Amino acid sequence: MPNIPLLDLRRGFAEIEEEVLSGFKEVFATQKLLNGKNLLSFEEEFARYIGTKHALGCACGTDALVMALLACGVGRGDEVLLQANAFIADFEAIHWVGAEPVFVDVDPKTFGPDLDDLRKKITPKTKALLLVHMYGDPADLDEILEICERFGIILIEDASHAHGAEYKGKKVGSFGKVACFSCGPVKNLNALGDAGVITTNDDEVASKIRYMRVHGQVEKNHSHFPGFNSRLDELQAVILRARLKTLDEKNEKRREIAQKSREGLSDIPELFVHPAPAPYKKSVYHRF
């Protein structure tokens, strides 16, 4: 039986090798390894792609989650709703800002939070909902946004599985107050190593994160508040710019494979098969 890898990083890099190596040579020539033109260009291109005012690169998706929570004022004494199948990084981020995670049951049809249980878990201490678009399937955003608005809950999206996913024609990552993306090696939009991006339409949140990722430095060597060392370097920005150009094409291929897999497995009653999303949802099938 042939060995078919789940992900072939070599082939993926070969497709962009010429563009990436050319970009690397330019970075080496300028010796501008951090906070250079490739980072700024990627942030502009990704914000345009998602449909938000701001995109901010950072070191990894976990850092993105921590900084997003802090920028939204989440901290000690607050509760954050989180679906029970979320990745450990979501739990860790809530823990590290001093808040309390409150787990919500999972809806097996959407892999997102069960909305009835979500409503039951809301208390006066509930500050935010950290919503994961699991496996690349957009969550039930209309109902979730209505719940958040009614109870005054901040919506923070974890779209690490969902680069390019759409809900009613609008990109995931543009619905919440802020959204977080991991661009690690196995993600749909992947760097050659760890990387992350934060998107938002909120100018104040964007400003906080922009300085938070560089030790709280509003001016060089002048830290106005405690921050982090969480920068997206120029080399990773070169790679992500190249990959972003073909992201929609790659996601469409994933949808085609998912549909063929669903059809081929549909006659096995004992097998739970990834359900087809609603017609107004466009999944990117990070996992099937």
What are these regions (language model features)?
Residues 70-159, 166:
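PLP-dependent aminotransferase-like
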Residues 157-192, 219-224:
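Conserved active-site segment immediately N-terminal to the catalytic lysine
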Residues 32-79, 93-96, 103-105, 170:
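Phosphate-binding glycine-rich loop
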Residues 92-94, 147, 171, 188, ...:
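Hydrophobic/aromatic ligand-binding patch that stacks against planar heteroaromatic rings
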Residues 12, 34, 109-110, 136, ...:
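Glycine-/small-residue-rich active-site loops that bind phosphorylated ligands and cofactors
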Residues 181-182, 196-201, 241:
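Short beta-strand-to-turn element immediately C-terminal to the catalytic PLP-Schiff-base lysine
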Residues 10, 22, 39-44, 49-55, ...:
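PLP-dependent aminotransferase class I/II
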Residues 1-32, 37:
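N-terminal "arm"/small-domain region of PLP-dependent enzymes with the aminotransferase-like
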